[in-house]
Every structure is written in structure tokens, then in C-alpha cells.
UniProtKB/Swiss-Prot annotation:
Protein's job: Component of the chaperonin-containing T-complex (TRiC), a molecular chaperone complex that assists the folding of actin, tubulin and other proteins upon ATP hydrolysis. The TRiC complex mediates the folding of WRAP53/TCAB1, thereby regulating telomere maintenance. As part of the TRiC complex may play a role in the assembly of BBSome, a complex involved in ciliogenesis regulating transports vesicles to the cilia.
Protein name per UniProt: T-complex protein 1 subunit theta
Cross-link (Glycyl lysine isopeptide (Lys-Gly) (interchain with G-Cter in SUMO2)): 224, 254, 260, 534, 539
Keywords for the protein's UniProt record, in alphabetical order: Acetylation, ATP-binding, Cell projection, Chaperone, Cilium, Cytoplasm, Cytoskeleton, Hydrolase, Isopeptide bond, Magnesium, Metal-binding, Nucleotide-binding, Phosphoprotein, Ubl conjugation
Main location: cytoplasm
GO CC terms, sorted: centrosome; chaperonin-containing T-complex; cilium
């Protein structure tokens, strides 16, 4: 009989076998900081217009080529619990503002890196946290003073276009003027009088071929589908939408039939035909000339639809059906009954068109007062179009933010350097040990212009010293000139490089909260993972014998 081996005394004694336990500065805090630094370093090189792309292949073997931090993090599936906190902060930024996710990561990474220096010098964690929280509060007090201008008229396409340049530029440098104009046209055309803008009302349809500059905006909806029948174009369309198949009702009983004569064979399907004819005629008599269905279309129903000159469109996606109902003002009917006038939708024209070599059905409103607008994107590869779609998404979200708060702050690192300068001065006036943390908080802001400079290929230290010198003279709006080949600065307000006030406000708040949360952790206790061994993923033939 084997002897009972006692567990080592201490915390591990209380836990189940296989559980892991880390505590103290070395094991918990520094480890967490290291993980967050690594994550921030990964996305830092993707920051700004000259940021590098990342090639990510997810667990479904889908390829992503992008410099959008939100997409990179979503597909990376980060496992480390501390790094996950930073990822969650960037997801919150994505939900709140729709842009600035990389700012949160880079800034939180810089805060933790500088906190590690202070902890190694002998400051306690609570002093660092207190200093960071005071500095964050001070940054939010200073930020309103840095506002350089406000959006005046959100119904002017040219003004809106100029305000969207910066957010689009970070994803599609070189195409920002063209894309910002498209996004502005789409947003302004459906901006309601109430001022409540819904980002879901801007749809994107990606069609392979041609180039980015062949993209266009359309008031209405575009579907990559073909029409089912012979009718391919209808003006002044009255639309009936059905969520059921466009077919006759079939009973669930067995259909065994005994036919004794040729006449009976002739009359066999006549009743079914007459019923289908009556159903389609009843729909046509209501004035409906376009039928959209969410199910299959029977051959017989198609024949009668052609007979009564009804255009038939089949949409497999229930989401597409819902959006179409919203666009044309229709109600989706669950059964093949003739619609009443209130249930029918209206559209100026519905037609089949060919874009490149792709057939599309277009539901078009001539007036710019539709509920939904569609941006038709063209591009040479699917990955490129996906990246352009992300740029469009950022632009639309920026417009949404401007409808909530019209204030703008200078971009290109100008706001960050001014905050760093003023918070450093404030830190000098604080008597306690938290002054060191406040100064480090200010220093963390330098990570943003430093990342922009490094990604543009110029010397970061030279740029930052130039920016400090200019800001010391009182030029608050001067930031990094990313187009210059040598370290240079210029006025961001004149250059039109502007960031939203809300975007900056939330990014600073969320990054600080995430960094403080990571620093507050002094113990990590991990239970043994449940279940047996997981099968190896990726190998399709993992259970077959290997012939080496």
C-alpha cells in the first residue's frame, strides 16, 4: 500500500490538484505587464496611416490582411487573462466610438511599461494607481481646452467629407479623399431630422473587379442576386414581401393517386394549376408588380408570375428581408395571401443590373430621403475590399460620433503632446509620491506620436523634441507631418487632420481603467481546465495512421 504524500503547506494545500497559483510582484504583476506590453507592441506597428498590415489566419483558416486593431484582436483569440482585459477595453472603445481601438492598446501598453519602471524603483502599486487616476482626471479637465473647432453643418457633404478624412486615412492612406466623399454622401442622404443616426442604415455591397475609384453610392439597396422570372425591370414598384416559399400549400398526407383514364390524367394537376393561378392573380390585382420571397420559388408559381408581369426576387437571408422591408416600407407576410395597401412597400425603380461580371438587383429611391443607403465597393481582391469596408465602417462611426458631440481636437500627436506638457507641469506641483506616477502618465502620451513617427520611418526622438519646442511657444495645434521625409511638424487644423473629442475622451478613460485593473491584480489562481484532452485542431486526418 502506497504511503500518503502530503501536499506542500501554504496556499496550494487548499486547492485541487492541477491548479496553478501565482502571487507577488515578480510572479503576478510583472508577468501581467509583460503580456500586455507584448500585445501593445504587436498592434503598435499598425498604428496610423503608415502602419504595417498584419496577416492573420483564424481558426477557420480565413485570411485577414489588415491594420485595423479591432479586427486583429477579434481574430487572435487572446488567452492570457491580463492581456484579455486590455482587449476588452479596446472592444469597449469599438462599441462606444467605433474607432481608436489601437490608441487604447498602445496607450495602455505604455502606461503599464512605465508603471513597471516605477515599481522596480520601489514605489508601491497603490501609489502608482493613485497617481494614474489623478492624472486621468486632470487629462479630462484639460481636453475641452484643446478643442480646435466644431462641426457646423452635418448636412453639408463637403464639410462632413473633410471631417471624415482622418478616420479613413488610417485604414486607406491614399484613397481617403474619394472614400470620405462616398461615406459623407451616404450618411448625409439618410440623416434624419430627429438627429438619431443609425450606423446599420449604411449598407456595403462588395463586388469583385475594377478598382476602388469605381465605387459608388446608391439610395436604396443592392443585392448580389438575379431575378427569378422574365421581368427584369419595374418602374414605380409596388412591392409585396413574403417570408414563406412562393409555392402552393402542400398537404402532409401521402399523395398516392389511382388514375383510370387519359382524361383523369389530363385533369390531375389542373386543380393545382387553377389554385396557383388564382393566388398569383389575386396578388397582381392588388397592384403589386414586384414580389420578394424568403423561400424557394416553384416552377408553376414562376410561370404565373411571368404571365401577370410580376418581377420575382428571392432573398435567402432573413436579415436582408428585414432591411429591405425597412428600405421600402413593407411588411413581411408569413403566408401567400394578397397584401393590403398598408403591407406593400414602394420604390421608384427595381431593376437587374450587371456590375463587372456580377448580376445585382437594385431597389432604388430617386429622392435622398430613403431609410437605407448602400455603398457599392469595387476592388481587385476580396481582402482589399474587406479592408476598404473596415475603413467605411470607421468613417460611418465617426459621423455617428459627430452627431452626438460636434467638437474636434487636432490629430497627428498634437493633442497628446499638449496633454503630456500640461500634465507634467501639474505633476511638478504635487507634493506626494504620486507625482512620479503623474509624470509617467504624461510620458505615456509620447507613445502615440512616437508610434506615428516610427511607422513613417523618421527619427521619433527628433520629432518629439520638435513638437515639445513648438508647443512650449503656445502652438497647441501642431502635430507630426507624416508626409515629410525628414522629421517635420505642421499645423493639424490647417492640414485638416482632426480627431473626434469623444473618441479621445473615451480612449484615455478606457486605457487608464484597463491599466489600473491590471496593476491591481496581485494573485492569479487558475483552476485545472475541465474535460479530457482536446483533439488537435487544423489536421483533417488526425485520427488516421501517419505514413512517415
Amino acid at each position: 500500500m502506497a504511503l500518503h504524500v502530503p501536499k506542500a503547506p501554504g496556499f496550494a494545500q487548499m486547492l485541487k490538484e492541477g491548479a496553478k497559483h501565482f502571487s507577488g510582484l515578480e510572479e503576478a504583476v510583472y508577468r501581467n505587464i509583460q503580456a500586455c506590453k507584448e500585445l501593445a507592441q504587436t498592434t503598435r506597428t499598425a498604428y496610423g496611416p503608415n502602419g504595417m498590415n498584419k496577416m492573420v489566419i483564424n481558426h477557420l483558416e480565413k485570411l485577414f490582411v489588415t491594420n485595423d486593431a479591432a479586427t486583429i484582436l477579434r481574430e487572435l483569440e487572446v488567452q492570457h487573462p491580463a492581456a484579455k482585459m486590455i482587449v476588452m477595453a479596446s472592444h469597449m472603445q469599438e462599441q462606444e466610438v467605433g474607432d481608436g481601438t489601437n490608441f487604447v492598446l498602445v496607450f495602455a501598453g505604455a502606461l503599464l511599461e512605465l508603471a513597471e519602471e516605477l515599481l522596480r524603483l520601489g514605489l508601491s502599486v497603490s501609489e502608482v494607481i493613485e497617481g494614474y487616476e489623478i492624472a486621468c482626471k486632470k487629462a479630462h479637465e484639460i481636453l475641452p481646452d484643446l478643442v480646435c473647432c466644431s462641426a457646423k453643418n452635418l448636412r453639408d457633404v463637403d464639410e462632413v467629407s473633410s471631417l471624415l478624412h482622418t478616420s479613413v486615412m488610417s485604414k486607406q492612406y491614399g484613397n481617403e479623399v474619394f472614400l470620405a466623399k462616398l461615406i459623407a454622401q451616404a450618411c448625409v442622404s439618410i440623416f434624419p431630422d430627429s438627429g438619431h443616426f443609425n450606423v446599420d442604415n449604411i449598407r456595403v455591397c462588395k463586388i469583385l473587379g475594377s478598382g476602388v475609384h469605381s465605387s459608388s453610392v446608391l439610395h436604396g439597396m443592392v443585392f448580389k442576386k438575379e431575378t427569378e422570372g422574365d421581368v427584369t425591370s419595374v418602374k414605380d414598384a409596388k412591392i409585396a414581401v413574403y417570408s414563406c416559399p412562393f409555392d402552393g400549400m402542400i398537404t402532409e398526407t401521402k399523395g398516392t393517386v389511382l388514375i383510370k383514364s387519359a382524361e383523369e390524367l389530363m385533369n390531375f394537376s389542373k386543380g393545382e394549376e387553377n389554385l396557383m393561378d388564382a393566388q398569383v392573380k389575386a396578388i397582381a390585382d392588388t397592384g403589386a408588380n414586384v414580389v420578394v420571397t424568403g423561400g424557394r420559388v416553384a416552377d408553376m408559381a414562376l410561370h404565373y408570375a411571368n404571365k401577370y408581369n410580376i418581377m420575382l426576387v428571392r432573398l435567402n437571408s432573413k436579415w436582408d428581408l428585414r432591411r429591405l422591408c425597412k428600405t421600402v416600407g413593407a411588411t413581411a407576410l408569413p403566408r401567400l395571401n394578397p397584401p393590403v395597401l398598408e403591407e406593400m412597400g414602394h420604390c421608384d425603380s427595381v431593376y437587374l443590373s450587371e456590375v463587372g461580371d456580377t448580376q445585382v438587383v437594385v431597389f432604388k429611391h430617386e429622392k435622398e430621403d430613403g431609410a437605407i443607403s448602400t455603398i457599392v465597393l469595387r476592388g481587385s481582391t476580396d481582402n482589399l475590399m474587406d479592408d476598404i469596408e473596415r475603413a467605411v465602417d470607421d468613417g460611418v462611426n465617426t459621423f455617428k460620433v459627430l452627431t452626438r458631440d460636434k467638437r474636434l481636437v487636432p490629430g497627428g500627436g498634437a493633442t497628446e503632446i499638449e496633454l503630456a506638457k500640461q500634465i507634467t507641469s501639474y505633476g511638478e506641483t504635487c507634493p506626494g509620491l504620486e507625482q512620479y506616477a503623474i509624470k509617467k502618465f504624461a510620458e505615456a502620451f509620447e507613445a502615440i506620436p512616437r508610434a506615428l513617427a516610427e511607422n513613417s520611418g523618421v527619427k521619433a526622438n527628433e520629432v518629439i523634441s520638435k513638437l515639445y519646442a513648438v508647443h512650449q511657444e503656445g502652438n497647441k495645434n501642431v502635430g507630426l507631418d507624416i508626409e515629410a521625409e525628414v522629421p517635420a511638424v505642421k499645423d493639424m487644423l490647417e492640414a485638416g487632420v482632426l480627431d473626434t473629442y469623444l473618441g479621445k475622451y473615451w480612449a484615455i478613460k478606457l486605457a487608464t481603467n484597463a491599466a489600473v485593473t491590471v496593476l491591481r491584480v496581485d494573485q492569479i489562481i487558475m483552476a485545472k481546465p475541465a474535460g479530457g484532452p482536446k483533439p488537435p485542431s487544423g489536421k483533417k486526418d488526425w485520427d488516421e495512421d501517419q505514413n512517415d
